[in-house]
C-alpha cells in the first residue's frame, strides 16, 4: 500500500469511526488502534479480539490468548510492520500510545487532531493534539512502515 492509499484508507476509517459510541471490546482506544493496523498493515488482531471482552482485564486475557500479548506496548514493540519514532516526527496515521497507571491508551495522530476514544463523552471523537501533555507522560509513537 503506497502513502496515498494509506491516507485514503485512514480518511475512510476516521469517517467510519468518528462519533461511534465508546464500547469496551469494540471501540475502546486499543481496538481503534488495532483497526488502524488492520487497514494499514493487514494485522488481523482486530478481528480476533473484536467483541470478545467487556472489561480491560478481560481484554488483556483475550489478547494474551489470541495474539500473545497482554499489553499493547509489548505487542507494538514486536510487530515488524511498525517502527518507533519520536513524538516530534509524528504525522498522520501514527499511533501514539500513552502509558497510564494500570493500562496504556492509544490515539491516532491526524495532524492537528487525534482520533480518540473518550471516556468523557463515551464516543470516538476528534480531539486537539496537546504535545506538552503527551510529553509529560510515558509514551511511544509508532508508524506503519
Enumerate the language-model features and the residues they cover.
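Polar low-complexity intrinsically disordered regions
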Residues: 1, 102, 133-136
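...with weaker cross-activation on analogous glycine-rich loops/strands in unrelated enzymes
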Residues: 57-125
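Intrinsically disordered, low-complexity regions enriched in small/polar residues
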Residues: 24, 55-58, 71, 111, ...
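Long hydrophobic alpha-helices with heptad-repeat/coiled-coil character
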Residues: 1-13, 116-129
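Glycine- and charge-enriched low-complexity intrinsically disordered segments
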Residues: 126-145
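N-terminal capping segments
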Residues: 1-69
